[in-house]
Curated annotation (Swiss-Prot):
Record-listed ATP binding positions: G15, M16, S17, G18, S19, G20, K21, S22
Binding-site list for GTP: D64, V65, R66, T67
Record key words, sorted: ATP-binding, GTP-binding, Nucleotide-binding
Similarity comment: Belongs to the RapZ-like family.
InterPro entries named in the record: P-loop_NTPase, RapZ-like, RapZ-like_N, RapZ_C
GO molecular function: ATP binding; GTP binding
Protein's name in the database: Nucleotide-binding protein Rfer_1653
Organism: Albidiferax ferrireducens (strain ATCC BAA-621 / DSM 15236 / T118)
Function description: Displays ATPase and GTPase activities.
Superkingdom of this protein's organism: Bacteria
Amino acid sequence: MKSEADNLQIVLITGMSGSGKSVALHALEDAGFFCVDNLPPELFLPFVALQKMHQTKRVAIAMDVRTASSLPLVPEQLATLQAQGVMVKSLFLDATTGTLVRRYSETRRKHPLSQAASEHSPLDQRRALVDAIELERELLADLRENAHVIDTSIIRPSKLQGYVKSLISTASEQLTLVFESFAFKRGIPGDADYVFDVRMLPNPHYEPELRQLTGRDLPVADFLKEQADVALMLEHIQKFLNQWLGALARDHRSYVTVAIGCTGGQHRSVYLVEKLAELFGDQWMTLKRHRELEASPLTLE
């Protein structure tokens, strides 16, 4: 017989200030979740108990660094809920320090820890903001360690909303493989568990008729399929993942992000992500993300 907890799904959203938590929370609200922002950790378990009593099916909760003194309670609270059979997913939104500084500078909003940082620093306003961001990283390190990280440094708000919805739609007890293409020239994704460098493979960019296309287009796919090194790289990545995915699933990992990088994030990495998602789609839940094809700055709300 199922308990009442079996019908309750909880998504906890934490992360860096300015990383897009409000965008993610709005996405879940649109998906039918009952959403609460800035819930103090002390009220987390009582709030969940209340939702069980009301037979709420799906709840999304956002917490941030303003309750830093109580955040160490959260990992144990999540473990308690999981032991009760509650479906829990924890998402941590992140971005590079430079990206967060730019977002705050553009909107002229104040970081929630900026006062604490500036009290102990004679440096200018930008330095105080960087200090606040780095302090926040330290305070949230444990939450980041135990969550699925989403790097929002280069992503449109609409794409972030769609990505969050796709993540929460997967079964919580099953490992989900996220394949992500990216360009090394724009940095390695901060949410990657494994990174494969494919810049040594033949580059369609130097074929004039393929330059403006992407790895999702048939002419590019046909070109890369004919390259022996591309087939060998695909085989080696497939073997590596097949070797370790079972162990990761047994370790109760909910998500594993595999990032494939080339120079521009347009041809080779995109093609390999498409192929890997196809190869692993029968055995695992798979999601695809092409960072550079979706790239656009995210702004604060």
